[in-house]
Amino acid sequence: MKCISLKQPYAEMLAVGKKIIECRKWCTKFRGDFLIHASKNVDIKSCNYYNIDENSIIKGAIIGKANLYDVKKYLNYKDFLLDANKHLSIGIPDDKTIYVFLIKDAAKLEQMIPYKGKLGFFDVNLY
């Protein structure tokens, strides 16, 4: 199964369905179900902004699953701002073109699975 790694707290917010758009600098042709991996790296500014204790969140593990059903492209900063309540990013993108992965059917796993993350979508065989 495909998997994508996100920094915390964004991995958690995606897994519980609060975050329904994932912004990336690259496009993908992949569509379908995927696993959500929480990176060992934490975005401290975002944790502070969302009042999340960085020590209370899972790191370095697969924590959820979701479905990527479409990809669209932001051509300017205005597009990015209009969807702020969906991607929950607090930073300003440094690229003029941002690809946004539209996500649905997110769910946390009952038990986390320790796993080393990688860049981009990567294959995971849990069996």
Language-model region placement:
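Structured alpha/beta reader/binder surfaces that contact nucleic acids or chromatin modification marks
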Residues: 1-127
